[in-house]
Amino acid sequence: LLSAATAARAQFMSAELMGGSALNVPTPLSIQQAGFPDIHFTAHYDTKPFGPYAPYYTWRVDFWNKKHDRAWEVQQVHHRVFLTNTTPEVTAFAIHFGYNYLLAGRAWRMHGFMLHTDFGIIVPNPANTVRGLSINIGPNAVDTGYGLSGVGGQIAVSRQFNLAKHFYVLADGGFMMGRTTVPVVNGSATVPNVSFHGRVGIGVEF
């Protein structure tokens, strides 16, 4: 019992909450809508990390081994994308209620840094107006809610700076890729995303 208790104390978990922003690489956007030709073009997105609506954020929980050099982790990234090169047919297109990554993976401590690799699912909630028909925009728009409709992953590097015992601040940089399908009125849109993320936040160790 004593050895089991000692082993339990040797292991610990950390929890982190961060804000930040992302640089989105231009990616193809494809829209299929019943009764109309398909739409294909290269989409440019802004993150607008501070609003409108819920800002960009991420949280991460790590479960470290006894040596404190490897961990299993879970993470949510509340990413946001707003189309900036709208067209006469696509007058608004955003996933600002969340291009949400729900991820699980591994972390390693190396030379004072933490390396993270994670994979998981995407749960988006879109807002768009295509050919005058709107989802989640305006008082008469269709509200679709959240739905599981994609997969993605990330590679990230973080660095901690201790504030006090058990508390620290951190900086984190990540590269993320994902692909999801979201509804438009009478159709759907395929929305891949490739993005570079910068984050800062606070953490606590238990």
Language-model-detected regions and their locations in the chain:
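Residues that define the transmembrane beta-barrel architecture of outer-membrane proteins
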Residues: 11, 53-57, 96-102, 147-153, ...
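Predominantly the C-terminal beta-signal and adjacent terminal strand-loop region
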Residues: 27-29, 39, 45, 158-206
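Transmembrane beta-barrel strands of outer-membrane/channel proteins
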Residues: 15-21, 74-78, 117-123, 171-177
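Gram-negative (and chloroplast) outer-membrane scaffold detector with strong preference
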Residues: 58-140, 150-153, 161-166, 203-205
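Short glycine/proline- and aromatic-enriched beta-strand/turn motifs that initiate or cap beta-hairpins
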Residues: 9-68, 203-205
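Flexible, solvent-exposed loop segments that connect beta-strands
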Residues: 27-47, 79-97, 125-147, 180-192
